[in-house]
Amino acid sequence: MDGVRNLTVSCASSNTCNDTIDDFRNQVYSTLYSMITVVGFFGNGFVLYVLIKTYHEKSAYQVYMINLAVADLLCVCTLPLRVVYYVHKGIWLFGDFLCRLSTYALYVNLYCSIFFMTAMSFFRCIAIVFPVQNINLITHKKAKIVCIAIWIFVILTSSPFLMSTSYKDEKNNTKCFEPPQXNQAKYHVLVLHYVSLFVGFIIPFVIIIVCYTMIILTLLKNSMKKNISSRKKAIGMIIVVTAAFLISFMPYHIQRTIHLHFLHNDTKHCDSVLRMQKSVXITLSLAASNCCFDPLLYFFSGGNFREGLSTFRKHSLSTMTYVPKKKTSLPEKAQEIYKE
C-alpha cells in the first residue's frame, strides 16, 4: 500500500506504456526520507530527553508527548532502510523480515500519532470546557491507561500490514514497499484500507474538529480571557495538530483511496498511471513527515518548554528548594493536571 511499482500497463488505445517514474521516485523518496530521518531523530530525541529528565512533574501532557516521541523514533529508525532501497534504485538488500517490519513500523507510527493527537485534543477539551465536572478524567494515571490502550489497539490492528512481503521481479531483483499484484491481494488491501480510513482517520478527524470547535468557543468567552497561558497552549495545539492532519494525514488517505481503486481498473491511460505514481511518492512522504510535526507540537503547544529546560538543567537545585504552592480553584487545578 505504500509503494510505487514500475508498472507496464495497457492504455486505452491498446498500446503499451513503458514510461516509468523510477528516477523521480528514487530521488524524491531518498531525499525526503533522509531529511525526515535527521529532523525526526534529533527533534524527537531531544523532546524525549527533556521530557524524561523532567518527568517528576508527571502531567498527562507529558505522558502523551513521551509516547508520541517513542512512536516517532521507532519509525525513524526504519527510514534509513527505505533510503538505501531507493538509493539502490529499488533493490531491497535487507531480507524479508526487515521489509515487513519497515512497512509495519510506518503504519504503526502513522496511526499511533493520529490516536495520540486525538486523545490529547479530547482531554485538552475536557480540561478547558468541562474542568470541574470531569477533573478525574485528565489525570496522569488515566493518560497512561489511554496510551497503553492505543499502543495495543494499533499494534494489533496494524498487523495485516506485516503481509507486505518482499518478492523477486522479472530481473530477479528483490523488491519491497510495492503495491499488491494479485487480484485477491488487492481486494484484501482495499478492505484493510477502508477500515483504517474510517477508524484511523475519519473518526479521529471528526473528534478533533468537534473538540477544537468547543475549545475555541470556550476561549472566546470572557471568563477564559484571563488565562492567557492556557489560551496560548490550546491555540498552539490546535494549529499544529490541524496542520499535521491537513498536510500529512489527509492527502495520504485521499490519495491512497484513489490509488487503490485505480489499481482495480483493467484499462489505464499512460498519463494517468504516471500522475498516480508521482502522487503516491509525494503523499507517502508527507505521511512519513508526521514524525517532524510531533516535536513542533511540544515546542508550540507546550508553553512551559523553556521552563522544562530550566528544570532539567537545575533539577538538583530545585529538589533542594521548597516553594509552597498557592491554593487553586478547580478549573485552575484541571489546567495544572494537564499542564505542559
Swiss-Prot record:
TM segment ranges: 32-52, 61-81, 110-130, 145-165, 197-217, 234-254, 280-300
Topology, Cytoplasmic side: 53-60, 131-144, 218-233, 301-340
InterPro entries: CLT1_recept, Cyst_leuk_rcpt, GPCR_Rhodpsn, GPCR_Rhodpsn_7TM
Keywords noted in UniProt: Cell membrane, Disulfide bond, G-protein coupled receptor, Glycoprotein, Membrane, Receptor, Transducer, Transmembrane, Transmembrane helix
Disulfide bonds: C99-C176
Membrane topology type: Multi-pass membrane protein
Major subcellular site: membrane
Family matches, as PANTHER family: CYSTEINYL LEUKOTRIENE RECEPTOR 1, PURINOCEPTOR-RELATED G-PROTEIN COUPLED RECEPTOR
The name this protein goes by in its record: Cysteinyl leukotriene receptor 1
Gene field: CYSLTR1
